[in-house]
């Protein structure tokens, strides 16, 4: 049995391509390309080599660490994530990340990290 208000309001089949995003922006070494389907935002995020949230997005976000939750699939490269509580992990291709607010992240190695993130509402930074 579904809880009231948990079902999506999907009325028709939809298709979009991240190679033709509805919204795109670059902050330092981090690029974001977003499409929106109903209430779901799908964002391809590219952390170039040397990218670090606290250096590339901190000033823009206005917070000491990223305060947005993330659910994402890593497609290529590696990403190190350190939470405000000190816990940390490294994510590689095929890994699913589920991060609560309060973290920093940066690329590991000499390959950009690309991941696709799924969010709803205002769970992503807009330029």
Show the residue positions of the predicted features.
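A short, N-terminal "cap"/entry segment at the start of jelly-roll beta-barrel domains
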Residues: 1-46, 54
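Glyoxalase I/VOC metalloenzyme domain signal
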Residues: 18, 49-51, 120-122, 127
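A generic structural signal for short beta-strands and their flanking turns/coil linkers
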Residues: 38-43, 49, 70, 75-77, ...
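Conserved short histidine dyad/triad with adjacent acidic residue
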Residues: 44-65
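Short beta-strand segments in beta-sandwich/barrel cores
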Residues: 52-53, 77-82, 105
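Glycine- and acidic-residue-biased ligand/ion/polar-headgroup-sensing regions
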Residues: 59-85
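Short acidic-glycine-tyrosine-enriched beta hairpin
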Residues: 83-102
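Ligand-binding loop in jelly-roll beta-barrel domains
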Residues: 100-125
